[in-house]
Amino acid sequence: MGNELLSTARIYTFKIPDAYNNVIDFDQFKNKVILIVNVASLCGFTPQYKELQLLYEKYHERGLEILGFPCNQFGNQEPLQEEEIVESCRRNFGVSFPIMKKTKVNIDCDGHESELYKYLKSEKPGEVGFKGVRWNFEKFIVNRKGEVVARFNSLITPLQLEGFIEQLLSE
């Protein structure tokens, strides 16, 4: 029982820099639904930013937080610097949700990997038990209790998650 409580509360222990190096303390997300997405500017899935923003505008006041984590591990599709990424997202998709510092969502050849993503993947392994993030715009959802309750691949669009998000916000 104690390990279960530790596991569910662990999401709130993370402190991660945003694109401007401001530290975001995940403790502020207690009692909120969090959608965590690894993003890239030059990916075929990049238009998903628009749907993410629509969800953010519609549900932020009810407790939805969306965090975009730029990642350059898939086909070098995020070559921009952090501030350029934010500017591109705002200009092209009207993004107002937080964009974080570039992140290693999977372990690289030097052994570097985001502790947050290591945690998310351990809580919700991917398809057929594959733990690694397969591509840009893979999504993790954390409920109001801090539990990682779902993981969706890149083919699932943000708007396809709307009903699930509404359900979690109602809990």
UniProtKB/Swiss-Prot annotation:
Its EC number is 1.11.1.24. It holds the Pfam family GSHPx. GO terms for cellular component: cytoplasm; peroxisomal matrix. GO terms for molecular function: glutathione peroxidase activity; phospholipid-hydroperoxide glutathione peroxidase activity; thioredoxin-dependent peroxiredoxin activity. Disruption phenotype: Sensitive to hydrogen peroxide. Unable to filament and thus, escape from murine macrophages after phagocytosis. Also displays defective virulence in the Galleria mellonella infection model. The active site is at C43. The keyword Transmembrane helix does not apply. It catalyses: a hydroperoxide + [thioredoxin]-dithiol = an alcohol + [thioredoxin]-disulfide + H2O. GO terms for biological process: cellular response to oxidative stress; lipid oxidation; peroxisome organization; positive regulation of transcription by RNA polymerase II. The keyword Disulfide bond applies. Disulfide bonds join C43-C89. It is an enzyme of class 1 (oxidoreductase). InterPro entries: Glutathione_peroxidase, GPX_AS, GPX_CS, Thioredoxin-like_sf. PANTHER family: GLUTATHIONE PEROXIDASE (PTHR11592:SF78). Involved in oxidative stress response and redox homeostasis. Functions as a sensor and transducer of hydroperoxide stress. In response to hydroperoxide stress it oxidizes (activates) the transcription activator CAP1, which is involved in transcription activation of genes of the oxidative stress response pathway. May also play a direct role in hydroperoxide scavenging. The enzyme is not required for the glutaredoxin-mediated antioxidant function. In the presence of peroxides, GPX3 is directly oxidized at Cys-43 to form a cysteine sulfenic acid (-SOH). This is Glutathione peroxidase-like peroxiredoxin GPX3. It comes from Candida albicans (strain SC5314 / ATCC MYA-2876). The lineage of its organism: Eukaryota, Fungi, Dikarya, Ascomycota, Saccharomycotina. The gene is GPX3.
